[in-house]
Amino acid sequence: PLIFGRRMNGIGFEYMVASESVALSSMGFEVIRDLEPGEVLYINTKKEIHTNIIPEVSQSPCIFEWVYLARPDSTIDGVSVYKARLRMGQTLAKRIKESNLEIDVVVPVPDSSRSSAITLAHDLDVKYREGLVKNRYIGRTFIMPGQSVRNKSIRYKLNPIELELKDKNVLLVDDSIVRGNTSKLIIKMVR
C-alpha cells in the first residue's frame, strides 16, 4: 500500500508519501488518496504532481498488512485496519460457534490480535483476558535467523499470567501463523 497527502506550510503545500495513513495524519497531513496498483507518483521541484499507471496491473494485497504490520489506527485502500480486524474476530466467532467448543476465556497473543480477540470473546459471550504479557524490547521473532534463536526470543518475548490461564479452557487468538513454531511454544507456555 502507498498513500499520499499534503499540508500547508508558510509558502505553499508540502507532500508526504507513506505506507500507512497514520504516518500522514500524525504529522498533520491531509490524506489525498491511495495510489493504485502499478501507479507511479512523481512530485517535481515546482511541487507539480504527476502520476502514471502501468496498464493491466491487478491488486494483490498482502494479508500481513491487515493482520500484523499496519497499525490499527491506519487506513489501507479506504478501509480501516481496526475495523478489518474487528470483522476478522466476528468471522472467527461464527466458525467457532459451529464447533461447540467449551471455552472459558479468550486470550490474545499481543499485540495485533487484540481487537479481533475482544470482538471474538464478545460474540461468543466468553470472558476476554490479557493472559500474556509482551516484553516490548524483543523484536519480531518470525524474521530472526535460525529456529533456536527464534525459540529463545519467543520465551523472552511473552510471559503468561497464570491467574488468567490456570485450570481454564483457553482460546488463544494470534494474528497470523508463519511457520507454526511460535504457536507451539506459546501453547506450551500457556499449558
Give the predicted meaning of each segment.
Residues 1-112, 121-155, 160-161:
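N-terminal segments that mediate ammonia production and transfer
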Residues 153-191:
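PRPP/pyrophosphate-binding module of the type I phosphoribosyltransferase fold
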